[in-house]
């Protein structure tokens, strides 16, 4: 059995560590085909819908190729996702070097903006590939999560009532310039 970020896994069984007061989820076998490293791009995934303007997002940056917005699952106030608008890459294995470079350059700018706007003492830059690695939306995305001294990073979701998402996005966006 191995343990990774809240998962206890054997070859065919994973237990997802629950948040306080919740029951553990158990999955067996392999994830669905489109949740593995190889699969088909789903045009109805939430990030594709954000790109098309079908879902709202608290954007901190956008250009013709990349958009960065607050994650709906805030691991810390200011947790931003950076995605390509031009690529239908599900994971890093599908992404062209040019598109990956553009996404990472914007992730770096977001990290700098979080440091300035939020006074972050540290930053987590994370990118997951496949359900086995914790990927839940199969459109390549990079997490940029601010951290502060004295407050160890938490992978528990920040309660939405604790955040003014629009104000937070505006602060980060202002520091992007």
Q: Which role does the model predict for each range below?
A:
Residues 2-6, 19-177:
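HIT superfamily nucleotide-processing domains
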């Amino acid at each position: 059995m191995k343990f990774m970020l809240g998962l206890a896994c054997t070859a065919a069984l994973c237990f997802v560590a629950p948040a306080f007061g919740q029951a553990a989820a158990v999955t067996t076998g392999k994830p669905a085909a489109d949740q593995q490293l190889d699969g088909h791009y789903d045009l109805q995934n939430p990030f594709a819908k954000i790109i098309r303007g079908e879902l709202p997002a608290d954007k901190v940056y956008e250009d013709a190729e990349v958009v960065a917005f607050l994650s709906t699952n805030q691991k810390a106030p200011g947790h931003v996702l950076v995605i390509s608008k031009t690529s239908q890459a599900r994971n890093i294995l599908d992404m062209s070097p040019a598109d990956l470079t553009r996404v990472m350059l914007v992730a770096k700018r977001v990290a700098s903006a979080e440091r300035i706007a939020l006074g972050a003492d540290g930053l987590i830059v994370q990118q997951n590939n496949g359900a086995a690695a914790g990927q839940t939306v199969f459109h390549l995305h990079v997490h940029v999560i601010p951290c502060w001294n004295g407050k160890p990073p938490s992978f528990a979701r920040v309660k939405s009532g604790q955040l003014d998402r629009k104000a937070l996005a505006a602060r980060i966006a202002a520091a992007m310039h």
